[in-house]
UniProtKB/Swiss-Prot annotation:
Keyword entries, A-Z: Cell inner membrane, Cell membrane, Membrane, Protein transport, Translocation, Transmembrane, Transmembrane helix, Transport
Function: The SecYEG-SecDF-YajC-YidC holo-translocon (HTL) protein secretase/insertase is a supercomplex required for protein secretion, insertion of proteins into membranes, and assembly of membrane protein complexes. While the SecYEG complex is essential for assembly of a number of proteins and complexes, the SecDF-YajC-YidC subcomplex facilitates these functions.
Entry keyword annotation includes Membrane: yes
Similarity-based family: Belongs to the YajC family.
Classification via Pfam families: YajC
BP term (GO), one: protein transport
Protein name: Sec translocon accessory complex subunit YajC
Gene designation per UniProt: yajC
UniProt keyword annotation of Membrane present: yes
InterPro entries hit by this protein: Preprotein_translocase_YajC
UniProt subunit comment: Part of the SecDF-YidC-YajC translocase complex. The SecDF-YidC-YajC translocase forms a supercomplex with SecYEG, called the holo-translocon (HTL).
Length: 142
């Protein structure tokens, strides 16, 4: 058996061949491949910024401006749904006093103001008057 195993080992040694292959150099630009993989992420972030973050920041600035410009005598709507008239504006502690009924006043934070309804009404009346003026001028010219 030992002679048989030696013959098998000799046959196995004879059958091992090493094939040589031609090596072709592949040029890769690592900078370019890195940029192409980053491009979609940059585009997604840009879309996210312009569709979500920028409008939200704009609304926040408008709201801060609205709250800072509230004056005594204006009708306001609070975030809890209470309508009232501003009777006192305190600049130093960011509070306002709102009269919600005759001789019923509440203290609230300026940040609780959602809308200044007296200004909204003025804008609505102006728009309505402009529409009426356009209809009247259109009827006169006919």
């Amino acid at each position: 058996m030992s002679a048989n195993t030696q013959d098998n080992q000799a046959n196995n040694n004879d059958t091992i061949e090493i094939q040589e292959t031609e090596v072709v150099p592949v040029e890769t630009n690592s900078l370019q491949s890195g940029l192409t993989s980053l491009t979609p992420m940059v585009l997604i972030f840009a879309v996210f910024y312009f569709l979500l973050l920028r409008p939200q920041e704009k609304r926040r600035k408008e709201r801060e401006k609205l709250v800072s410009e509230v004056k005594k005598g204006e009708e306001v709507l609070t975030n809890s749904g209470i309508y009232g008239i501003v009777t006192k504006v305190s600049e130093n502690d960011n509070n306002i006093e709102i009269e919600i009924a005759k001789d019923v006043r509440i203290k609230a934070l300026k940040s609780a103001i959602v809308d200044i309804t007296s200004r909204t009404k003025e804008v609505a009346v102006k728009k309505e008057n402009n529409k009426k003026d356009k209809k009247v001028s259109g009827a006169k010219s006919s």
